[in-house]
Amino acid sequence: TYNVYSDGSKKKVNEYTHNEVDAKNFNAKTSDMLPEAIENMSIYQNEVNDVVKYTNEFRTEAGKEPLKLDETLTKAAMVRAIEMAYSNKFSHERPDGNMCYYIMRDFGQDIYGVGENIASRQRNAKEVSYAWKGSQGHYENMISSSFTRIGIGVIKFYGTYYWVQLFQY
């Protein structure tokens, strides 16, 4: 940004930088993202615990048993959050074209009996949890009696949060 004066001179007063991510060629595998996912489990530990807390409060209100936080599901959810952020593909479909639940194969688990909620832009666990509660399909996943375990993924990338809940029987 410049101040331009009547004599034609100008003075630079601010420099604007624009960061844009080129995600067209994103092709990372789960194994590529796993070290960051594991690190993010520590970085976002409070957010993970808070989403689980809100989810279990909603389940209690609905007369359901609480979900148990599962380490493998959390790793998988963290990878899902990372791949959505880095690929700029906010979808239940993974960047490789497979559906979201196929991530479980990368962790040696069955793809059946898996549910996923995704969200972006909410700034904290309370916001995202209540956004999911306010959406019928997401809320149904949260309170489903079929699910017994949960994993949470979150990443803040260029100022935007990406959130993932993975549920499993």
Where does each model-flagged region fall?
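Short, surface-exposed glycine/acidic/tryptophan-bearing loops
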Residues: 75-126
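N-terminal targeting leaders of exported, membrane, and organelle-targeted proteins
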Residues: 1-89, 145-169
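Mature extracellular or exoplasmic CAP/SCP-family domains and secreted bioactive peptides
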Residues: 129-131
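Short active-site loop/helix that positions an aromatic residue
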Residues: 139-144
